[in-house]
Amino acid sequence: MGRGLMNSLKPYLAMISMQFGYAGMYIITMVSLKHGMNHYVLAVYRHAIATAVIAPFALFHERKIRPKMTFRIFLQIALLGFIEPVLDQNLYYVGMTYTSATFASATANVLPAITFVLAIIFRLESVNFKKVRSIAKVVGTVITVSGALLMTLYKGPIVDFIRFGGGGGGGSDGAGGSHGGAGAAAMDKHWIPGTLMLLGRTFGWAGFFILQSFTLKQYPAELSLTTLICLMGTLEGTAVSLVTVRDLSAWKIGFDSNLFAAAYSGVICSGVAYYVQGVVMRERGPVFVATFNPLCVVITAALGVVVLSESIHLGSVIGTLFIIVGLYTVVWGKGKDKRMTDDDEDCKGLPIKSPVKPVDTGKGLAAELEMKSKEGQEAKATTTTQVEI
C-alpha cells in the first residue's frame, strides 16, 4: 500500500519540485542579465551544458530501447529545439528585463489555459460537461487564468511581508539599484512590449508541450529526446546568435554569476525539466504538466522579495489565492480522469465469461427423443387401462 501511494504521488512531487527549480532560474537569470549577460548567448550556453550533461545518460540507459530515427521525427525535434530553447526563452529573457522576475513568472500562469485549449483542439484532452470532473477542469482553468490576470493587471498597494532596513547599502552594484530612479522609469516605458513578449513566450511554451506529447508517442525515449532537443536548440540558437550578436566579446564567460546561470538553467530547467515533464506527460498528459506552472509565481514572488528586493502588491496576494484554488480544482478533475482511465483498462484486462451451451454430439439428442418416446408410451398404456376398467 505504501509503495502504491508513493507511485501515485510521484507525478505531483515531480512537478512541484520543478516549480522550485524554475523559481530559482527566474531569480538567477535576472541577476545574470542585469550584470550584462547577453540573453542569446545565455540560451546557447544553457543548452550546450544541458546537452553535455544529459547525453551520457541517454546513450547508456536507452541504448536498447531507443527507437529508429525517421525524417518526420527529426523535423519535429528540430521544431521543438527552435520553439522552446530559441524562440521561447529569448522572448522570456527580453520580456523579463523589460518588466520583473515576478511579473515574468506571473504572465506564464496563462499557460494552463492555452495548453488546455490546444489539447482539446488536437484531441489530447476531452471535455464532457455532463461529467463533474470535466467541469472541474474547465472551472479550475478559468480561476487560474483569472488569478494570473489579476496579478498582471492589478497591482494595488504594496504589502510589506518583509521590511528591509535603511536601503542605503544596496549601492549601484546589485539588483536593488535597478529599481530606483531611471531604472524604474525605463522599466515602465518598456512594460507593454515586455508583456507582449512574455505572452508570446507562453503561447510558444504551450505549443512545445503539445508537440512534445505527440513526439513522445512516436519516439518514447525521454532522455534521448531531451538530449536531441537541447542539441538542436544549441545549434539553432548559435545560428541566430551569430546574426544578432555582432560583438564577439559577449561570448566571453568566466567563473562568475553568468556561468552559474547558464549551468543552473541548463541542467535543472532544460535537461532535467524536459525529461521529467516528458515522463509525467506520457502518463498524465500535457495539461497536467502545465497546470502546476502557477505555483512558480508564488515561489518566485517570495524569492524576489528576499533576493531582488522587489515589492509584493495586494494584487499578487489575491491572485495567488485564485491560482492555488484553480490549480487544485484542475488537479482534482485530472485525478478523476486518471482513475476512470485506470478502471477502463482494468475492465479490458478482465476475462469475459459468457454462458456456454453444451455441444450437442447427437447422442444427447437421441437420448432425449428416446426418453420422450417412453413417456408417451407409458401415458398411452395408462389411458388404455383406465378405459378397460
Curated annotation (Swiss-Prot):
Q: Which GO terms describe its molecular function?
A: transmembrane transporter activity
Q: Which domain of life is it from?
A: Eukaryota
**Main subcellular localisation:** membrane
Residues in EamA domain copies: 23-150, 205-331
The entry's localization annotation reads:
Membrane
A Pfam family this chain is assigned to: EamA
Tell me what topology the record assigns in the membrane: Multi-pass membrane protein
Alphabetical keyword list? Membrane, Repeat, Transmembrane, Transmembrane helix
- Which residue ranges run through the membrane? 13-33, 40-60, 73-93, 102-122, 142-162, 191-211, 225-245, 260-280, 287-307, 312-332
Gene Ontology CC: one annotated term: membrane
Region annotation (Disordered) maps to 339-361
InterPro entries reported in the protein's UniProt record: EamA_dom, WAT1-related
Q: Which family does it belong to?
A: Belongs to the drug/metabolite transporter (DMT) superfamily. Plant drug/metabolite exporter (P-DME) (TC 2.A.7.4) family.
Protein name as catalogued: WAT1-related protein At1g21890
What is the protein's species of origin?
A: Arabidopsis thaliana (Mouse-ear cress)
Q: What is the lineage of its organism?
A: Eukaryota, Viridiplantae, Streptophyta, Embryophyta, Tracheophyta
